[in-house]
Design a protein with these regions (language model features):
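Cysteine-centered motifs
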Residues: 7-9, 44, 74
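Short basic-hydrophobic amphipathic alpha-helical segments used for membrane targeting/insertion
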Residues: 22-29, 33
Length: 412
């Protein structure tokens, strides 16, 4: 271990001193085998003793076992029925809506929306308007536009949420690269220095991933790579690095950090030594455990938005930690999402994520109009109940949001 800490920054995981690397890998493998066996035993016992409906609540991605999203529901008994529902075209689906009591003024228009959006995607939007969930009959007076309005609201909520996620993600990338490049060992190539990580396993996984990303760019000869760039002759940064430099074999961190996906960025932050995680969090006026939790939530919400999933009236499965420190901007009443508070709001829906995004925007974009746009969106759709997002009716009166509105009114 002392030899490992004293060795110079390796260019590859294979450049580590051989006996030391083997010892570390053997120990890591042994730990992994013990953990895998233990989780396998626990998973088998869980499957044998727990009704399938409860597995979604008892298994988590971190456990290494089965994971089902909170939207998943399953019968306690093993399924025995054969699925025999026929596929219907949009005109038949319009007739089904009419049979269930939905008012449709223009059938051709409704059929067009079903053709280009899909009956299945619209189905969750019909649930609040159903008087009977068994036969899916609608509350008298419900129109097709009522359902479409929910879908449009959710789509606009996607766009607004994605806007804030983009700003926060870019800020985290910049903070990680800046802090690690100037305050840690290794300079621009800090990610190759084992001492910057919690352990060898985290270090090894990160370096291997970056080497893999770089190797993808080396698959083409330099002349071929140049042909792959756009016609304006602005080659991407990785292509430029590979065509210009022979060493180090991987590019500097400010380039590498842009190659990572949001999920890889979140894992990289979690793998860093704690003192660096704290420094990066301070850059955003957050605490280390709060930022680590929020990043996990952002990856989940980002993936939902990227795949056009539903944000409205949905349990996310992963939710952000509620900050306890007074240094982190949050709602005036910090017990709003406290599970010990009988009047607390649901933590597993979108609202805590929205609050966390605005909390970070106070630092990275102090005069952003994002909060005002959120308020305008909800006012634009008054028939959308705020509790579907886990929001109270008077949510905008909180001093937290009032400060955001005031800052936005000054200038962007």
């Amino acid at each position: 271990r002392l030899q490992q800490r004293e060795c110079s920054c390796p260019q590859s995981t294979h450049d580590l001193p051989e006996p030391n690397r083997n010892e570390l890998e053997i120990r890591a493998s042994a730990r992994s085998s013990r953990v895998t066996a233990r989780h396998l035993t626990q998973s088998c016992r869980l499957l044998l003793t727990t009704p399938p409906r409860l597995l979604a609540h008892q298994s988590t991605p971190k456990s290494g076992g089965f994971y089902l999203s909170t939207d998943y529901t399953c019968r306690a008994n093993s399924p025995t029925r054969h699925y025999s529902k026929p596929a219907l075209n949009e005109n038949d689906l319009v007739k089904r809506y009419l049979e269930r009591g939905l008012t449709i003024a223009d059938r051709d228009r409704a059929a067009r929306y079903l053709r280009h959006i899909g009956y299945y995607r619209l189905s969750p939007c019909t649930i609040p308007f159903q008087v009977d969930r068994t036969n899916h009959s609608f509350t008298p007076g419900t129109t097709f536009d009522d359902i479409l309005n929910v879908y449009v609201f959710d789509r606009e909520l996607h766009l607004l949420t994605t806007d804030a996620l983009e700003r926060v993600e870019v800020a985290v990338r910049a903070a990680t690269s800046n802090i690690m490049s100037t305050h840690s060992g290794g300079g621009a190539f800090w990610y190759r220095d084992y001492s910057n990580y919690q352990n060898y396993k985290d270090y090894s996984a990160t370096v291997k991933r970056i080497e893999h990303l770089t190797s993808l760019g080396r698959q083409y000869a330099p002349s071929t790579r140049r042909e792959q760039t756009d016609r304006l002759h602005y080659p991407d940064a990785l292509t430029h690095y590979l065509d210009t430099y022979t060493s180090p074999t991987t590019p500097p961190s400010w380039l590498v950090i842009e190659l990572l996906t949001a999920g890889e960025l979140q894992r990289l932050y979690a793998d860093l030594a704690r003192k660096y995680r704290k420094a990066i969090a301070r850059e955003l006026h957050l605490t280390e455990p709060v930022l680590q939790s929020w990043l996990k939530s952002y990856v989940r919400v980002r993936n939902i938005c990227a795949h056009h999933g539903r944000l409205w009236n949905r349990f996310l499965g992963v939710y952000p930690a509620i900050p306890k420190s007074g240094t982190v901007r949050w709602l005036s009443d910090r017990s709003t999402f406290d599970t010990s508070n009988p009047e607390a709001l649901e933590r597993k829906r979108l609202y805590p994520v929205l609050v966390s995004l605005q909390s970070t925007l106070f630092t990275i974009s102090p005069h952003s109009s994002w909060a005002l746009r959120l308020q305008n969106l909800l006012e634009k759709h008054p028939r959308i109940p705020p509790n579907a997002l886990s929001m109270r009716k008077g949510w905008a009166a909180d001093r937290f949001w009032q400060d955001a509105f005031k800052a936005a009114s000054q200038h962007e």
